[in-house]
Amino acid sequence: MAAEGKAIAKVNDLVIFVPYVVPGDVVDLQIKRKKNKYAEAEAVKFHELSPVRAVPFCQHYGVCGGCKWQVLPYSEQIRYKQKQVEDNLRRIGKIELPEISPILGSAKTEFYRNKLEFTFSNKRWLTNDEVRQDVKYDQMNAVGFHIPGAFDKVLAIEKCWLQDDISNRIRNAVRDYAYEHDYSFINLRTQEGMLRNLIIRTSSTGELMVIVICKITEDHEMELFKQLLQFIADSFPEITSLLYIINNKCNDTINDLDVHVFKGKDHMFEEMEGLRFKVGPKSFYQTNSEQAYNLYKIAREFAGLTGKELVYDLYTGTGTIANFVSRQARQVIGIEYVPEAIEDAKVNAEINEIKNALFYAGDMKDMLTQEFINQHGRPDVIITDPPRAGMHQDVVDVILFAEPKRIVYVSCNPATQARDLQLLDGKYKVKAVQPVDMFPHTHHVENVVLLELR
């Protein structure tokens, strides 16, 4: 399997990437795109099914674009993810490595996400089976997921296996009410229509947040919209936060928009080891709560804290890792690009009465400088959890200048992690590697690496 989750076929030295098939399948392929060194294709006929193939459990498999590895048993999924980490670190990093620990699989392989966002559209995607029936469909409104490569088309989702079933019941109830009362769904090209997005967040504390996003251009639409909100509140009394956002822009970003409370609170909480983390409608929080806890425990274990260390937490986000390790450190300093995330980090520190954590907002390469190190002290430990692109060269240079005893590198992209490890290799030796599966049925894998000063 390739890193993008596609299977690989070879014809006369031409490498062909094929989605929705598994090693051992015998298929006819149709080339969809050809480059100099590789091609992309799709399977048009199956002659023989692989003995390792699993039966997809989701009725939307192969259309919605998510959970592409349902056709692999979970044991095979994590085997390929383990191999992906090993291949990236060895082929890209080209550094000396210890034995890589077996990947930590997810206890939950279904209903493991705590957040899903659904899109409304008046252009429902018709599946191949529906098109072949040559029937005119009266109801072309849909709420579900975007179709890959067709931004204005949405696949109507009946059941998604990623979030607790309350999510399915809420989405389907909203859809049916909107159908019955003739609410307009947004046209993603012309931006006409009322209903835009539906976000559902659950938490380990049992709280439930629902955010409905709409476009309101006339007074009577607001009254209609509030009737929908009241229907949701009456139908699902377990909702602890029913919120709405009016978005009259031409895009779906909500960071610059006000959030209004229709019922309940404007936030909910996640809990780990007695710590409470406030999660608002715009807050980032790892979407697999149980596996995030395991990931953070690994990072803390690798950090080897005794209570005397100054810890820098780079790309701290909402400060979850920083606050999580603070009780084992002398002081923690978190740095993050997004100001709103830093405000969340400070709030979470205050909620948990954490006095030894400081947080700073700014671009990492501009914030983490030699002057910053000289002012705040040389860290004993650096924990870094960068975005998929990895760390900027300037950030790597300052880490090398700071010379912490240990670096804990948490990555959602082992390829860029491997590149960065190579840049650190002159001064640091990799001591431990622990892959973690946060997203079953996808090709994505997290990896935690411990480096120690040579």
From Swiss-Prot:
It comes from the Bacteria. The keyword Iron applies. The active site is at C412 (nucleophile). Its EC number is 2.1.1.-. It is an enzyme of class 2 (transferase). Keywords: 4Fe-4S, Iron, Iron-sulfur, Metal-binding, Methyltransferase, S-adenosyl-L-methionine, Transferase. InterPro entries: MeTrfase_TrmA_AS, MeTrfase_TrmA_CS, NA-bd_OB-fold, SAM-dependent_MTases_sf, TRAM_dom, U5_MeTrfase_fam. Residues 1-45 form the TRAM domain. [4Fe-4S] cluster binds at C58, C64, C67, C160. S-adenosyl-L-methionine binds at Q286, Y315, E336, D385. One of its GO terms (biological process) is rRNA base methylation. GO terms for molecular function: 4 iron, 4 sulfur cluster binding; metal ion binding; rRNA (uridine-C5-)-methyltransferase activity. The keyword S-adenosyl-L-methionine applies. Belongs to the class I-like SAM-binding methyltransferase superfamily. RNA M5U methyltransferase family. This is Uncharacterized RNA methyltransferase BT_0643. The lineage of its organism: Bacteria, Pseudomonadati, Bacteroidota, Bacteroidia, Bacteroidales.
